[in-house]
Regions:
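Residue(s) in the substrate-gating loop at a strand-loop-helix junction
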Residues: 143
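Conserved glycine-rich cofactor-binding loop
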Residues: 8, 15-16
């Protein structure tokens, strides 16, 4: 029997990419779902398909996580009506590429609110009932950018570093109360993130599929790992960075961006 069969998972940013793959793979494993993103119409079409294919319950919550009221709204429509969440997947987020001083400040502050503030708020809301039940788990979608500062992705890499260290600390706080916390750190993945952000030419390595990334994330939390790097090449790079001065890794990343002549000002997409 599947580890997730009969359990209920909440996936944020579920309309595209990694979030959509989390929803599809969890439903295929027999999990009931609550899926949320701004695009309610797309979510409702997904929900109908998943219900038909896998005979699971799928609830749709249209919510903009840039709205401070959204985490409470999502909580009220799940735990608040007797639908306990066994797994929270904090996936919603976005990135931007460009010189920090040239990128719009309001968008960079929105990035912090979505990638960090909403993630913390949702974790705080849903962790409490998990701890009371002494059962559950949270997956935070971070990035390989969490392991060093990334020039031209300065705010984005900083938000993902927060997600990683927050997850590692929370995992230890919760381990004796039978709640698992895990950070999933993917590298280049075949979503629309790089294309819209203007970085599609940056990495010539073979990207992973969202399904490969999600499989790694689910395996990690099932095994109680506090973080996992998805993909052998990404694991090698993340491991090797431990042996180099931080300034070396940061400057190497800057040279790579300059080599590919990325736009010095631009916007990235929301992952959800």
């Amino acid at each position: 029997m599947s580890y997730w069969r009969g359990k209920r998972a909440l996936v944020t940013g579920a309309s595209f990419g990694i979030g959509e793959s989390f929803a599809r793979m969890l439903a295929a494993s027999g999990a009931h779902l609550v899926i949320t993103a701004r695009s309610r119409e797309r979510l409702e079409a997904m929900a109908r398909k998943l219900q038909e294919d896998h005979s699971v319950e799928v609830d749709v919550v249209g919510a903009d996580l840039l709205d401070d009221a959204a985490p409470q709204q999502i909580y009220d429509l799940t735990e608040g009506v007797g639908k306990p969440i066994d797994l929270l997947v904090n996936n919603a987020g976005f990135g931007m590429v460009g010189d920090f001083d040239l990128l719009p400040l309001d968008r960079q502050l929105e990035m912090i609110r979505l990638n960090v503030t909403s993630l913390v708020a949702l974790s705080h809301k849903f962790l409490k009932p998990m701890l009371a039940r002494q059962s559950g788990g949270i997956i935070h979608v971070a990035s390989t950018a969490a392991f060093q500062g990334v020039p031209y992705f300065a705010v984005y890499s900083a938000t993902k570093a927060f997600v990683l260290t927050f997850s590692e600390a929370l995992a230890v706080e919760c381990e004796e109360r039978n709640v698992r916390i895990s950070a999933l750190c993917p590298g280049r993945t075949t979503t629309n993130f790089q294309q819209v952000a203007g970085t599609s030419s940056l990495d010539t390595s073979n990207p992973q599929t969202p399904e490969e990334v999600v499989r790694k994330g689910l395996e990690a939390i099932e095994k109680g790992k506090s973080h996992v790097v998805s993909g052998a090449q990404n694991q090698t790079v993340a491991f090797a960075e431990r042996f180099f001065p931080r300034a070396f890794a940061t400057k190497a990343a800057a040279r790579l961006y300059r080599r590919f002549k990325l736009p010095r000002e631009g916007n990235g997409p929301e992952e959800a």
